[in-house]
């Protein structure tokens, strides 16, 4: 989760945690590692950690420079994704997002959905249908350790 969102919406954060979900650090301001100095990037991750207290980290945009990865891997299990749903795209509808999942998912996939206003309508449509379809196909869901 983005630290700034946790800071702004602590009740929603608690609800997610109490629902049994694992929370991962996603920086405080959704910084792109590629365009950020290592010091600034690490400082931003640390700022988010003040609210999150997680040993999991997922780099925004799935991009991280090697030195940032090296430094963060000392403290975090770094989680990358292999299927981005593009739920944030104004050019896609919920049906398109669901079709992307059906087309590209494979065993072991980590699927990325977003919790932003931009993605809300697609998320609301595609997430429950994706879960239902994935279970029908024999997939299961696991929590990161």
Model-derived segments and spans:
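Active-site beta->alpha N-cap acidic-glycine motif
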Residues: 1-47, 53-55, 140
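Short histidine/acidic/glycine/proline-rich micro-motifs that form metal-
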Residues: 3-6, 29-32, 63, 84-87, ...
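C-terminal domain-boundary segment and adjacent tail
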Residues: 6-8, 121-145
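Charged helix-capping and loop-helix junction motifs
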Residues: 14, 38-45, 93-98, 124-128
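Glycine-enriched alpha-helix->loop->beta-strand junction motifs that scaffold or abut catalytic
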Residues: 18-23, 72-81, 107
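Conserved, mostly hydrophobic/aromatic
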Residues: 23-26, 48, 57, 78, ...
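His/Asp/Glu-enriched short active-site or ligand-binding loop at hydrolase and phosphoryl-transfer sites
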Residues: 63, 69-102, 138-145
